[in-house]
Every structure is written in structure tokens, then in C-alpha cells.
Amino acid sequence: MTLLIASSSIGVIATGHAESSAVSVGRELAHSYDHGNCLACHSAPTDELAVTLANIAPPLLNMKERFPVRKVLFEYIWDARNTNPDTIMPPFGSHEILSSSEIHKIIDYLYTL
């Protein structure tokens, strides 16, 4: 029985670590010059690690409140042209700049802002 409790505790720790890891990877992708590079156009005023002078696109603030339906934000990052044909935002998913998994990790990070 002690072994079962220890296994349960490890499972909880692993789950918490996985969530933290997804946010961390999402932050790295959003800050990366060769992948997401969100900071090329967006500022992230509440992220002290996001150093940018960008003001081309809306700031990355209150993202969970602005996009309460995760799928809407995913589809916008995947290919914003589907919503706004005149957008200057790159179609990250449809042009294979980011994978579906990477976009989900970026959203995990954005939802902390």
C-alpha cells in the first residue's frame, strides 16, 4: 500500500512538471528568433524575460480572457488569413513554421500572460 501511495505522489509531481514544462517550452518558442518569434511584432509587458520594442501587433496581455476558446487562438496562430485575409501575421501552421504541438505549447505560455 505504501508503494501505491508513492506511485500516486510521483504521478502528481510528474503532471505538475509536465504543465510547467509546456509553458517553459512555449515561452522559448515565442521568444525564439528561428521559430515562433512572437516578439518580433508583439510586446509581452507582463513577461519580464520578453525584451522587445515591438509595437506592430497587439500586445500579448490578458490572453486567456481575450481568447477564452483555445481553439480560436490556435486557428488564428495556425493561419490568421482564415479570419483576416489582410493580416500581416505569418501563417505559422499552414506554412509549417510551427507544428501543432508547438502552437499548443505557445498557447500554454500565452495563457499565463
How would you name each of these model-derived features?
Residues K71, N82, G93-L113:
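C-terminal capping alpha-helices of c-type cytochrome domains
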Residues L29-Y33, N62-K64, H95-L98:
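Flexible gly/pro/ser-rich segments immediately N-terminal to CXXCH heme-c attachment motifs
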Residues G11-Y33:
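Electrostatic cytochrome c docking/interface patches
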Residues H31-A44, F74, W78, I88-P90, ...:
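C-type cytochrome heme c attachment motif
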Residues M1-S9:
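Bacterial N-terminal signal peptides
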Residues A40-W78, S94:
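Gly/Gly-Pro-rich "capping" loops immediately C-terminal to redox-active cysteine motifs
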